[in-house]
Amino acid sequence: MKIDKYSAILGNTVGYHDMSTLTSHRPVASLPFDGKYRLIDFPLSSLANAGIRSVFGIFQQENISSVFDHIRSGREWGLSTLLSHYYLGIYNTPVENTTVGPEYYQQLLTYLKRSGSNQTVALNCDVLMNIDLNQIFHLHNTIDRPITVVYKKLHLQNISEVNAVLEIDETDHVTEQKLFDGKDPDEVYNMSTDVFIVDTPWLIEKIEEEAKKEYPQKLRYILRDLAVEYNAFAFEYTGYLANIHSVESYYHANLDMLENQKFMKLFSPNQKVYTKVKNEEPTYYSKTSNIKSSQFASGSIVEGTVERSVVSRRVHLHQGSEVRSSLLFPGVVIHENA
């Protein structure tokens, strides 16, 4: 039975990132962003806006409970109806490994074969963007290639060693890819976002071939190699993008939202971003509060000074407290005169 025209594979990250203690008890996908969101909200919202109602999330087993808690039934992203499907595949291979165990592809192949989809999109949670997937599906269906890849032109400081950079010819097709090792701060690189549109029957065939190997690679490495082998069409993404690969990049991406132009590029009126609904009271600002260039989620109490900061839900800033150029996580308490 045909369930949907499109299906999706959603991963946590494009590679291993040293995020210090931020990811000690949760994956990158569950990290807060801009006060009330989580990083996973953005790829899920891109899928929802494209009408994709069949999603397979594949995450490492460790610290997965926060993903379950946030997504729940998937109602906010249109994944809780009789005709929608959200599955969560769990694997045990360490996140820094490039190879996987047999359960990784067993789950994935079962999902793809049952989806009945024509095309599948693969994407991750650490490349933060709000992309119109309908546009890319349309382009993919007009070209004679089984795979399309999305890239973004970026400078050295915005790319990490786990990202792939692409060589693209004058007809917008991929001729080469390699892990980033750039040294020139003035050069602009074609960084792969690791967003791929692929023909589902073709993808199943390629995954079955990989799964037979003694040490099969993770999906992203297969797709990167296939993009070169089949000269994938390369689609340039020109909207806001933050490559979350370190604590510093995560911090700066949050503070970017204090700049109106960047905020509007990410939160486009035509591409709504959905998140878990919480019925909380509005944030309370006392007479002693002093606010400058900051953003607040709901449910907080502000009695102190806040400048150029992003404040999450249920934060209490006591009288006399001062917060500047900061990102405050949910439930934080800043005491008096701190």
Tell me the role of every PLM-derived stretch.
Residues 1-12, 201, 210-338:
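Left-handed beta-helix
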